[in-house]
């Protein structure tokens, strides 16, 4: 028995039949949220934490060379405080306007769906496959866990400090690094090799080589 790995977080209800939106934290949503899948709902006694670098449990990886469909579960977020766990079974799931909608067994109306809001959805770390690079033909790509990336300092090739990686966003179009700026606000940087050529957890930093306009916030 491994440790819980977060694959999603329940958002607001959708409609009146019990559907909920899910903030996906996995690159394998079609597998993790397929009908019949069983997920453990983790509810914190206190406020939910933001994704953290020291999240427990193994996780599938994201890679600088990987795009949509790369194998992985983030494992980068978990609830703060003693969790209360229950098992939810997926009845149906579908994409709607770029968001994943999920219906769970026994959740049949909007009130029941609202009661799930904010819950973390987890799987056992033993269910996570080995880290692989699915789209690097030369097998020389590198893969990184979310927990390896969050907390790293970001700088340009010239050495200018951009901030610190505060989150890894798993979107249908690929992974995005949220970099917190020292002066406030965030940069959103696509996690692809052309833009993030260097990831060095041992040195505590990444190098971001932004194309024109990427870091313009105005």
Curated annotation (Swiss-Prot):
A Pfam family matched in the record: PRC_RimM
**GO CC list:** cytoplasm; ribosome
Which keywords fit this entry according to its UniProt record? Chaperone, Cytoplasm, Ribosome biogenesis, rRNA processing
Q: Where is the PRC barrel domain?
A: 141-214
How this chain assembles, per its entry, is: Binds ribosomal protein uS19.
Question: What does the record say about domains?
Answer: The PRC barrel domain binds ribosomal protein uS19.
Enumerate the HAMAP family for this protein.
Ribosome_mat_RimM (MF_00014)
Which NCBIfam families does the entry link to?
Answer: 16S_RimM (TIGR02273)
For this entry, the protein name equals Ribosome maturation factor RimM
Name of the coding gene: rimM
